[in-house]
């Protein structure tokens, strides 16, 4: 869908990588491995994004590490577009409706790290949740966005953020009762 507006596949991948989850960082060689594209093409797009102020960089050792510039005036708009593109807005909308005492919903896995995937992994945290209703809402969301959704449910006492933080993973808080 967004590929129609933005013809560069590398640019779309970079938008997904950095604007879906603002805590994601990456350096050129890691992007080359992840995207399976040449460093030259990726470098050109990174330079354009950096010059426009969409991403920031810092040197860590001998690596130049990039991340989204969350202070950019268009950051929130781009983030919302990317969320809609991958269907996360529908997932959260469907889950939050009449679900019970929902506390938090996290995005984990490849999508949380800005990688393209047909599977959305979420973690649902709450008390006395209506699990049959949750399953029904997830199935509705899957049909609407044409992606598979895998979920894990934790009660508030069972949940520990460290459990869902694997090395190199950046869980993305999609919804919180405290918001």
Where are these regions (language model features)?
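Catalytic core of pol beta-like nucleotidyltransferases
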Residues: 1-13, 19-47, 51-99, 112-117, ...
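Short helix-loop-helix/strand-helix junction enriched in hydrophobic and basic residues
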Residues: 107-111
